[in-house]
Every structure is written in C-alpha cells, then in structure tokens.
Amino acid sequence: METCRCPLSYLISFLLFLSHSETACRPLGKRPCRMQAFRIWDVNQKTFYLRNNQLVAGYLQGSNTKLEEKLDVVPVEPHAVFLGIHGGKLCLACVKSGDETRLQLEAVNITDLSKNKDQDKRFTFILSDSGPTTSFESAACPGWFLCTALEADRPVSLTNRPEEAMMVTKFYFQKE
Amino acid sequence: MENLFQDTLLQSAGSEISISRVLRKLPETMFILYMLIMGVSAFTIQPEEHPGAAENCQFRGKYFKTDFRVEGEPVVLRCPQVQPWLWTSVSPHTSLAWRKNDSARMVPGKEETRMWVQDGALWILPALQEDSGTYICTARNASYCDEMSVELRVFEKTEASLPFISYPQILTLSTSGFLVCPDLSEFTHNKMDMKIQWYKDSVLLDQDNEKFLNVKGTSRLLIHNVSVEDAGYYSCAVTFTHEGMLYNVSRNIELRVNKKEEETIPVIISPHQTILASLGSRLTIPCKVFLGAGTQSTTMLWWMANNTKIENAYQGGRVAQGQRQEYSENNENYIEVPLIFDPVIREDLNTDFKCFVRNTLSFQMLHATVKEAASFSWGMVLAPLSLVILVLVGIIWMHRRCKHRSGKAYSWTMFKTGH
C-alpha cells in the first residue's frame, strides 16, 4: 500500500470494498514513457556508433563499448516504429533525392513525430522478424532495408537488395 | 550523406567528372570543399601557398576509439583521417608520418626494426607494453596538413587483461548464431584461405565439434543452439608471417547470452465500463493490461479524453495520468496506468475516457464512463460507523491483551500491519 495522507478514507474504502470512491493520494506521476531504448547489432556482431556525426557499424572493445549507440524506439502501429538515437533527438529517415535513396539522421524529436503526418512517414520503419533477428524496411521507401556492410566501420545505410551477401539486413534488436 | 560521399569518391577516383553537376547539390558541394580541405581530391588544382610545415598543421583531435592489444603480437595503427578503403585514391597525393606523443622523434626511428609504415599505417611487431601511448599521424599534401592522434594500450597477455581488451558479442538463447573475429583485415587481407583458430577459455575448439562450426574462409564461428553455458571468453587467432618469423594475432570476445523477450497480444482487463463516483471527490481509474509472458517494455499504455491527450485536455492537471506500473503476479506480466481525477466534476460525466494499449502486435482501446453515485449510500454511512466499531474493538482488545501479556509489544505491531 502506498503512503497516503488521508488514511481514514483509505481505510474506509478498504474495509468496505467501496470501489467507486477509491482515493489516490500519491503525487501525480510523470507522463508514461513512450520511448524505449533498444540494443541493435547485426548478425555479424557489429554494433552502431557515431563517427563524424555519421552512424557506422563495427566492433567495439573494452572501454570503447561506451560509444555504442542504442536505438530509441517509439511504436507507431503494429510492426511499425520510429527509430532515433541520442535520447530520440536524432531520427533515422529514408530520403529520396533524384534516383538516390539514402539513410539520413535528422535532428527531430522522436516524441514529436506523428503517424498521421505525411512528412513523418520517412521516419517510419516496418519490422519483420525471422527467428531471433529483425529486419527494418522503410515505410516511405518500400523495398529499402536498413543495412550494414560486411566490413567494419562502414556507414549504416539502406539497400534494396537485401538478399545480397555483401549487405547485412538482419539485426538482433532487443530491449535494454 | 554516405551514399553521396561514396558516389562522389568513386567519381573522383575516375579521371573525369562534371563539376557543374556536383555543384548543383549543396551537400555534394560541401563534400568537395571537405575534400579540398583534406587535400585528398584527385582533381583539385592545388594552390601554391601553404608550405605545410608541421607547425601549421591543424590538430583535429583524438580518434574516438582506443586500440587495446596484447604484447608479443603485431599491431597496426591506421591514420584516423584516412579510411582504409579510401587509401588507394588518397595515397598518390598525401604523405603520412607518425610520431609518438611523448617523443618528438618520428616513428619508426632510424634504428627501429619493430616499427614501420606501410600503406600509411604504422606497424608495430611485436608490440611491447611500453609501446602504449598516444601516436600522432600527420597527413600532408602540397596544400594542406592535418593531424590526429590514436591511443594504443598494450596489455600483458593474461586472463586479468581480458575485461579491458575483449569485444562483447551477444547471442540469443536457444538459437544458433555467429561469433565474429574482429579487426583482422590487415592480416587477412587478400587471403582467401584465412585460417582462424577458435578457443573457448583457452581450449581449442575441435573441428568435429557438433556445437561449434568454424566457417571456412570467413572470420565466423557458428554456435548451434546457444545455451547459458556457452557464455564466456572466446579467443580467435590467425598466424602472420613477417621476415620468416611466425606471429599470432589474437582477438578476445566475451559472449553474452540473452533471452529474447517475446511480445504477446495485450488484454485490457480493467476498468469496468462504468465507474461510479461522487462529484467533488477524488477518483482513480486504473487501466490494467494483462500481457501473460509478454514483455512490458514494448507495450504503450495511455489515456485519452474525447480523443484528446489527457495532458492537453486538462492543462491545469485536474485530471491526469498517474505513474505507469509494471509488475508480475504468478509469472504473468501486467501494466497499469491510472487516470486520476482531483476532484470529479459534472463535466466528467459527459466525457468519453478511453484507455489505449499498443505494442507491435496489437492495438486496443476500452471506453470508461464516469457516473454519479447516488448521494445517499449505505456504504458512506457504514464506513465511518464500522471504523469507529473497529477502532473501539481494537482498543478493548489491545487493552486486555496488554494486561495479560505485558512485554509482548509485537502484538501492537501485528495489529498495525494486519489491516
């Protein structure tokens, strides 16, 4: 039972099981957290980190592991999420310019994004699980998947050929 | 940005490029500028000033990663300004020089046989603990010069060093997955027949082991059906020959085994659709969600009033969402978020309150309506009455008990906590 500054009425409620006049005396709680931090690493065990403000995937040892970037995740719909880093202040987006499709980090707050806004669609990724791993397809760029290169320290990017052996599109994606 | 980066790079590596096309886009223009500054462009027309003397060199800071290696093995330090895959396009125009921070002398020194520079990288073979320190790479071309430092720490090859030098890798319980021997590219480059030996706790993993499969020609070890016992320290090693001498290059991996959290379809089990309340009183309506074995972490739970967020609808905070609670009963997971009225007013009787729950599998909603409780209720009369009776009974009981069993103070404690 929580501490309560109106014990009398609490006792009354308790004794008589009066469900309709339940009293809560705890101070108003903080807003429920809609954002969750997830660890992400690819099937080749590469984790994400920033190099010159660019998201790259590679291997971190010893005290370097504190550089690891975790993904901040806000669910949008079943199997669809917004993805960000740095406490949801930088969000992953699929941007098309000309015939080029690329992954971009944008300085927007993940909790300000809305699934109803068309311009926020580029931040939406569709999750699909296979066994223990997850793939991330861009909702704004259908057929384009979040990927890493086989080599370490290369940028995290998007590929439209997920079956190709040169790109890794399967990630372990687990809550902190 | 990266695609642009690579595209532009590939183009620059070629002989011809339309500059006007590149200039059309700002990011690309910025990249050109970057390349000019870096002096790595293959087509830059070099200005004749900037002699590039060491004192004019711009120091661009310390590389964000530290190299942790063990003594007796070869170590390769890469110049952080130049990514290895860019080296071939950069090398015709740029010279790289290395020096150690604590000495002005260049490395390798004249008498030095353990260190040399190859393809811009500093090789140390074999590394000694006293090689630990900060190394500065100076990249210079006709127009520009810049420096960055890299930190190297060479550890004794003992078990005590493992936590400082290991690469953590994670696999999921009861699935199969790979460990990867990292940062070996300098030693396995151009070698299709790379032979990596894998060890667990210093014991060589047998080729015919059903549990572990050393995937030929790759740096990967497949672990079948990962169990908790598979967690721990692994090492992988390749051999490297230099001037007739055989060296071991090893990397250490700490395998952690995680249990994957499963999601289930959440079920809202309370509130009841109609909640009775007296106007002017406080009211808490808990929205309680059953998840079974599913994870609480990915499940969102929130309230709305007439399709408006609670914090927007009641900016004064008369109605507010309480703290989210996550708990388990009999190994089943629940989440609860209360809606708190302080106090209930008539307007609330006509408001459509809704509790929403969402995770990646499902989205559900439940209506809750507040109804005014009858002004006279037996409950309200009985409540103070029963309390008075209870207290009286308690006092009498206490009194009698204290008389009979003096010194048994715990009975009072029991009475206090018993309710």
From Swiss-Prot, chain A:
Major place of residence: secreted
Glycosylated residues in this chain: N109
Domain of life from the UniProt record: Eukaryota
PROSITE patterns associated with the record: INTERLEUKIN_1 (PS00253)
InterPro entries for this protein: IL-1_CS, IL-1_fam, IL-1RA/IL-36, IL1/FGF
This protein's GO CC annotations: centrosome; cytosol; extracellular space; nucleoplasm; vesicle
Location within or outside the cell: Secreted
UniProt keywords, alphabetically: Disulfide bond, Glycoprotein, Secreted, Signal
A biological process term (GO) from this entry: response to glucocorticoid
Pfam families: IL1
Disulfide partners: C91-C141
Cited function: Anti-inflammatory antagonist of interleukin-1 family of proinflammatory cytokines such as interleukin-1beta/IL1B and interleukin-1alpha/IL1A. Protects from immune dysregulation and uncontrolled systemic inflammation triggered by IL1 for a range of innate stimulatory agents such as pathogens.
Listed name of the protein: Interleukin-1 receptor antagonist protein
Organism the protein comes from: Canis lupus familiaris
